[in-house]
Each structure stands twice: as structure tokens, then as C-alpha cells.
Amino acid sequence: MVEQTTSEPAAGSMPKISFGVKKREENKVQAPAKAVVIEVDLDSDEEREKNEMERAAKRRKVMHFEDGTVQGDIDKPKEAAVIPMVVEHDWRTQKLIEKEKAGTLTEEERAKLALVLPNGIDGENEEESGKGEKIVVEDGRGDTEDADYSAIPIESFGLAILRGCNWKDGDGIGKNPQKVALKLPNRRPPGLGLGATPKNPVGKNKNTGESSKAEEEKLEEIKVGSFIKVVDGRNKGVYGKVEGRDDDSNSLFIRTAIGGKTMKVSQIVAVAVSAKEYERDSKCLNKSEYDKEKDRLETERKKLESQPPSTSTSQSSKDYKSKSSSSKHDKNSSEYERNDKMWARTDLLVRFIDEDFKRGSLYEQKVRIVDVAGDNDVTIEDDRGNTHYNIRQSWLETVIPREIGEKLMIVAGKRSGQLAVMLDKDKRKEKVTARLVATNDVVTAYFEDVCSVKIRHEEDYE
């Protein structure tokens, strides 16, 4: 605080000014002392009522204030509704009831009335009469135009009628009452069309004999950060990591393991995989072909192991066994050589059997071989005239002509590459009888050694 004082100037002198500084007094606010809480057992009725009112006030719905107090509705506990069963009395019972109300009922008539109405006139002797909120049903049969249907919820109406027939919640109904568990249908994932069945291969392990060590990671619900594999659609076989979810459209945003691209896939075609499987298979480009080849080699190995060795003691049986085993070995080796040998030729009509090529668009279709440059470089033409390149021979199989007289080509043996006309077909023995076009010789061959042809230029075979 600054104070300014001035003195009257004397004649012929300058005025004097002086300043004084005073320290402001600070008023410190003292914190109140901590209140000491003493726990006292409240056993009086007044204290209990006060506590109950406080608890009710906490649950009270605030509507408005009046005179500084809260005015609102207290939610009363709802009781189960009961609709008493309407009983129609005949004229004899009605006469006894009227006498009972008038007070002129004799002891004999009172006994009759007790036999007719074991629960009393108004059901006052019924055990369940005091439980639940009763809805009185009038005996009159007047119009129900002014019926108040809001008196009871529609979902509670049927249960209220059953309670009026002495039914208790949880009891079974019928001659042999038993409790039946409520079966709730599974919620269909959004985006799944009507009639479609969702695929759920999650958690199904093909190798059921694996140890618990291999099952260290349990597959849970797909969430952000989970590893998934696409099992259907154009991105079939793609592995990725979930970066986001769109529950409204039941879709996932994933980042692919190969290429690191971000794509949106439906959750219906995605299954969760373990981190071990993701590290092992996510970088494999041709996983499906690798699995097929692995299964084929495993089948051949088991087939060879199942053949018992010859253990006969006699020399003749040894010779016979050795000859038969050698013939089997020669047959198997010849079949392997024939299957491994190039049999595909131009103008052959073959069937496409690979399911993964172009999402199965050519699967089980008949195609024509246009050019053959190698067992992994075959050019084909489909029924629409589209040409496909770099087709493997293992993706094709031979086709047998349907009608007698159609042309075919021998694709195995010493007559490989020769045209013939089919004369007969034996489906039981899987053989065809054909006449060679060049020499008119009649030959017999197995189904797998011949194939139908679709020749564009006849002069190439003259």
C-alpha cells in the first residue's frame, strides 16, 4: 500500500513530496479440523425407517422439486400377474352360493358347498391366492370394446393365465411334467444370406492325436491382432493379420503376409490360425499344391508298406512269389513310367480336374489341347474359345467317347499317337475295341490308354 503526502509550498520554494510503504496483512485461511467419525449401531425403529427412506430416495425417479424437496415416483417392485380361472356354476351351486351370502345356509348345505367348491366361493382357501397381482375377470359376457390391453404386457398374459390355474414358475406342464431347458437359436452372422450355412472350422484340428504341447495356443474369437486364413473366395489360401473390424458388415481389415497389402474380407470366409501355423505356412505361395503332393506321396508310402514280403519255405512257392512280385514290380514300374511319360497331344479332348486354377472356373469341364511344349507347358482351349497357357499335364485326364463310331487316339503303348474308330466299349472290364484308321487293324486297349479327339483339320492326319 502506497500513501502519498504533500505539504503546502512555501513562498519561493519547490513543493515537497514524500512516499510511505506499508506491508499488507495477510489473512491465512485455516483448514477445519478433521471430523471424527464414530460408528454407532442404529437399533431404533426411527433410524431404520430413516435408512429405508434414504435407500428409497436413491432409487427414486426425480420428476420436480416442491418446497426444496424432491418429488418423484418410487419404483415399486412388480409382482407376477395372476388371472384367476373363470368357473361357471350350475343352478344348484349358484343357489347354494346365494344362500351362503344371505346367511341362510344349513350345515348339510354347507357341506355340499364345500365339496363342490374346495377353494371356497372366491378361492380364499387357495394357497396361491395371496401371491402375485390379481387381475379380476368379470363374469359378464359384455362387449370388450373398451378393454384396457395395457393393463398387462402381452408376453406376461399367458403366464398370468397359467398362474390362475395353480401353475408355479419353473414347473413343467402335462401328464408327466418335467423341466425343459430353453434352447435359444444361434445368432446368424450379419451379411450371411438366407439358406447359407456358415463355415466354422475354427478349433477343429485334423490331427486329433497331437499332444497338449502342440495345442499350446487355443484359437479364440477373431479380434485385432489375430492371425487368420482365408478359406474361400478369390483370396482363398491368403494369410494375414487383423488390423480392424467392421461389425456392421461382418468384415475384417487384414494385412497380408505376402506383399503387405491391406484388404477387406468377410468374416464368414476367415478362420483364426495359431501363430505357429502362421509362421510356418504364411509365406508359402503354392500351399494347396504342396499339400496335394504330400498326401499323394504319403498314400504311396503306406501302400508300399502294406505289401507283405514273401516268406514261403518251399522253392516252388518262392519261385512263384518271386515271379509274381517281379511281375507286380514291373507292372507298377511300367504304370509309373506311363504316368510319368508325356501323353498329352494336340487335338485331344480332355477333362480339366484342377480345382484351384482360376477359382475352379474350368473344373470338370472338357477342353481341347491346342499345343504341347512340355508336361508343364500345355496350351488348351475351352468351350467358349478362350485359350489358357502354362497348363500342367497333371491337371488333365483322358475322356472316353460316348457313342460307337466316334474317333479316339491311343495315348500309350507302341501305337501311341494313332487315330482309331471305337467299335465297342466294355465298362465292366474298362476296355474299348477300336479299328486303326491307318492300317484298319482291330485293337483292344484300356480306358486310360485312349482319349477322345476333337480334330479341327483332318488333313493333318491323312
UniProtKB/Swiss-Prot annotation:
CDD domains: KOW_GPKOW_B. It is found in: Nucleus. The keyword Kinase does not apply. GO terms for cellular component: spliceosomal complex. Keywords: Nucleus, Repeat. Residues 154-202 form the G-patch domain. Residues 289-305, 318-337 have a biased composition (Basic and acidic residues). GO terms for molecular function: nucleic acid binding. It holds the Pfam family GPKOW_C. GO terms for biological process: mRNA splicing, via spliceosome. Coiled coil: none annotated. Its main location: nucleus. Residues 221-248, 401-428 form the KOW domain. PANTHER family: G PATCH AND KOW-CONTAINING, G-PATCH DOMAIN AND KOW MOTIFS-CONTAINING PROTEIN. Belongs to the MOS2 family. This is G-patch domain and KOW motifs-containing protein homolog 1. It comes from Caenorhabditis elegans.
